């Protein structure tokens, strides 16, 4: 069969690339404190297959995993953790559901969660320490799945990676007129939306 023939050939029958390139392959990009699901598995398996083929052809491959580790949901999670210091976060999915239920039903909690996001974005040390704890627990879960799938060599860049870079981007968008204020928020409209 074709598969058997490929297995006996050098590089499984894939020709070496005429020009070596550096290629970035995006993987599953799961969200901290949430379960990985079928959509994450699909992109992980396809991404890994592509990365392996590209490496066999001689390319340098960056296996990028852009993790959802920043944003509004962390205010909710961190505030829930602060209110329940003895709570177990080993089951982050259950912990997330509890926090979300409180966020949806308790106005005071919702306001404190929003304030906690601001503390996180400003780099409050206590908030950052709790945030790292949540991220670390999730990474253990993610790594167990990647190990089971024999996925190796992922380079993680979370959304948090860009936090200290955003101020300059926002200033540039404002200065050039690309961003504008609408309903109290700084936004960038697509030309067709104007």
Where are these regions (language model features)?
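NTP-dependent nucleotidyl-transfer catalytic core
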Residues: 1-194
């Amino acid at each position: 069969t074709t598969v058997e023939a490929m297995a006996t050939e050098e590089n499984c029958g894939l020709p070496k690339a005429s020009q070596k390139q550096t290629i970035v392959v995006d993987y599953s990009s799961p969200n901290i404190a949430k379960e990985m699901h079928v959509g994450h598995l699909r992109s992980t398996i396809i991404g890994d297959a592509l990365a392996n083929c590209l490496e066999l052809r001689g390319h340098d491959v960056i296996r990028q995993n852009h993790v959802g580790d920043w944003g509004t949901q962390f205010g909710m999670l961190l505030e829930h953790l602060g209110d329940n210091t003895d709570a177990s976060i080993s089951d982050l999915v259950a912990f997330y559901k509890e926090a979300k239920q409180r966020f949806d039903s308790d106005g005071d909690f919702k306001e404190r969660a929003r304030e906690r996001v601001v503390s996180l974005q400003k780099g409050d040390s206590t908030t950052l320490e709790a945030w790292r704890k949540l991220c670390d627990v999730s990474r253990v879960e993610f790594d167990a799945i990647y190990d089971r799938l024999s996925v190796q060599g992922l380079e993680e860049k979370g959304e948090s990676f860009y936090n200290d870079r955003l101020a300059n981007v926002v200033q540039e968008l404002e200065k050039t007129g690309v961003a504008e204020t609408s309903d109290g928020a700084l936004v960038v409209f697509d030309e067709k939306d104007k």
